[in-house]
């Protein structure tokens, strides 16, 4: 096995397997995980913006084929603006459409990343592959569990996986809060495991490059502490157990939701 390249994001997301993203839903409950699979929602504006920034930094050669920039159109708040926007989108099927102002802001965000000496070294140069995909299986409770991961950047030269995040606040305090809120630590546990399983590479470092989508587009580079990553590994193992439960043919709705018992909550000050 090895990392696979040139796999489109849509094809990757269609594969049913345990990933850092699906683990977030599973850790809430298997029922929430199954609902997330059944009800695919359109990406939010921040998610779309993040996708564009990723392409500008990691795959600039794909931008023209995947994105389109609207010419100056009337406001979408007007009927004429909505109609003209709909016509433009229909003329660019399969592309993510942005207004010029948003596209330029994304370009400035990407430029800020590449102006950071550390980030530029991580994302460019020999031994760098971007948007690489890994598939593998592991045995959990006597069941084979499919796993998958999509790495923003694997820098073989430096022996590290680097994940690019757009953030509201990329200061140490602000990004630490985002790590807690969005469970980013699961990636720090899951992605190095992917390289170990598909390529036999151990002791891989995992870093985040966080960039603010608004001026002045601050950039921070972060590595999680060992204790946080170990907790995330335990959570991924628990998510694998829950994945097996979610896909068990005899599982009922009552088995997959929250515990049907009184749970004591301890609330800190």
Which residues are covered by each model-predicted region?
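Metal-dependent nuclease catalytic regions and adjoining charged, substrate-binding loops involved
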Residues: 178-185, 190-269
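Conserved catalytic cores of phosphodiester-cleaving nucleases, focusing on short active-site segments
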Residues: 130, 149-177
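Metal-dependent nuclease catalytic cores that hydrolyze phosphodiester bonds in DNA/RNA
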Residues: 1-148, 257-258, 262
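Hydrophobic/aromatic-lined pockets within catalytic cores
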Residues: 57-62, 166-169, 196-200, 244
């Amino acid at each position: 096995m090895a990392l696979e390249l040139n796999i489109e994001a849509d094809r990757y997301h269609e594969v049913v397997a345990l990933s850092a993203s699906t683990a977030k839903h599973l850790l809430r409950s298997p029922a929430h995980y199954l609902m997330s699979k059944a009800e695919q929602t359109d990406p939010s504006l921040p998610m779309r913006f993040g996708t564009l920034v990723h392409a500008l930094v990691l795959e600039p050669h794909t931008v023209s084929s995947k994105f389109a920039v609207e010419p100056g159109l009337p406001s979408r708040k007007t009927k004429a603006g909505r109609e003209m926007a709909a016509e433009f989108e229909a003329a660019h099927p399969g592309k993510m459409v942005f207004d010029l102002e948003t596209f330029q802001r994304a370009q400035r965000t990407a430029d800020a990343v590449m102006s950071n000496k550390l980030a530029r070294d991580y994302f460019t140069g020999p031994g760098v592959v971007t948007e690489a995909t890994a598939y593998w299986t592991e045995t959990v409770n006597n069941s084979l569990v499919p796993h998958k991961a999509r790495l923003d950047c694997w820098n073989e030269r430096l022996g590290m996986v680097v994940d690019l995040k757009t953030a509201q606040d990329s200061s140490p305090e602000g990004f630490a809060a985002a790590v807690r809120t969005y469970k980013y630590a699961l990636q720090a546990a899951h992605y190095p495991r992917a390289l170990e399983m598909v390529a036999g590479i151990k002791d891989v470092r995992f870093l985040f490059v966080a960039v603010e989508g608004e001026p002045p587009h601050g950039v921070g580079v972060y590595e999680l502490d060992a204790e946080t990553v170990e907790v995330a590994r335990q959570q991924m193992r628990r998510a694998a157990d829950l994945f097996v439960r979610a896909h068990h043919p005899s599982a009922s709705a009552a088995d997959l939701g929250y515990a049907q018992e009184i749970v004591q909550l301890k609330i800190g000050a």
